Amino acid sequence: MLFKQAILVATTLTTLAVATPVVDVRRRTDPASSCSTGTLNCCNSSGTVEDKTIAGLLGILNIVVSDITALVGITCTPITVVGAGGTSCTSQTLCCDNNNFSGLITLGCIPININL
């Protein structure tokens, strides 16, 4: 019986380890007026992983980040066409490398200075 429990625990931990995303995003060096390597996003807020709120959210979502110095965008929506009618961003415009978390968290971001 103890052997079965040990196998169950080992299998569960292995599954969790494989399913937990590990993100390696380094500092972005794109100019602040272009977004050639990522996606343009309108984010409600942004900050670094040292920010307690962002660190807590990353922890709750089991998102492991390593050596990230770029900004993290929170609650972002993609901006598809710059200057098109109806497109506006009243919050923060960011260019982000990694949006694998349905817009809730975007990683590897830099601020973009454009008027939408």
Curated annotation (Swiss-Prot):
Belongs to the fungal hydrophobin family. The keyword Signal applies. It comes from Pleurotus ostreatus (strain PC15) (Oyster mushroom). Glycans are attached at N44, N100. Disulfide bonds join C35-C95, C42-C89, C43-C76, C96-C109. Self-assembles to form functional amyloid fibrils called rodlets. Self-assembly into fibrillar rodlets occurs spontaneously at hydrophobic:hydrophilic interfaces and the rodlets further associate laterally to form amphipathic monolayers. This is Class I hydrophobin 1. InterPro entries: Hydrophobin. The gene is vmh1. Aerial growth, conidiation, and dispersal of filamentous fungi in the environment rely upon a capability of their secreting small amphipathic proteins called hydrophobins (HPBs) with low sequence identity. Class I can self-assemble into an outermost layer of rodlet bundles on aerial cell surfaces, conferring cellular hydrophobicity that supports fungal growth, development and dispersal; whereas Class II form highly ordered films at water-air interfaces through intermolecular interactions but contribute nothing to the rodlet structure. One of its GO terms (molecular function) is structural constituent of cell wall.
